[in-house]
Amino acid sequence: MSLVIQPSLFGSLGELGVAQLGAAVERRPLSDGAWIDLRPGFITAADELFDVLAASVPWHEERMRMYDTTVRVPRLLAGYTQAETLPHPVLDEARCALSAHYAAELGEPFVSVGLCLYRDGSDSVAWHGDRIARESTGDTMVAIVSLGATRAFGLRPKSGGPGLRLQVGHGDLLVMGGSCQRTWLHGVPKVASCLGARISIQFRPHWGDQLRTSTAGGPDGKAQ
């Protein structure tokens, strides 16, 4: 698969790896007990990881039911359960680092890994709140690592009111926690022009087998 990666001043410098979390993580409280954490540059020298994932992951297209017709999901998808080997050891390092950092709050490790490939600006994901790995009244965390082109990541409260739009770049980490999946919606909108492809890597706790049927955005959730 031939894809264009957005040029990055830092993505090809240094050694591919996982940066420290700790004090480098910025928490932004939202309403209704929701919050997001941001850690720019969590994956260092990320160009290599983008290239490996784009070429080696078994990407597939899915379709979903919308009213009385079936439509193409506007992005390519892949998923790995706890029992499956991840496509690059840096993903194992990232999962371990996230599990250690959020152990006290989450109470369990991150397990499943979902991936989305946004081939260009016409690929997107609609407003939604994830149902994967949470109950109707329970909370969970979703940790998202972005590779490739910088894309807008929008969040807005379900109850109405102002939201926010973040520009998430190459190697950046965004974590949604607290009540975020119940009380807020998030999405990646289409853009008229885009400098390249984007890969989103989502780390979630338990229920990894659900990934097989829910990454397309069915009743159990969507992937970012």
Please tell me what each predicted stretch does.
Residues 1-224:
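Non-heme Fe(II) oxygenase metal-center motifs and adjacent flexible, charged/small-residue loops
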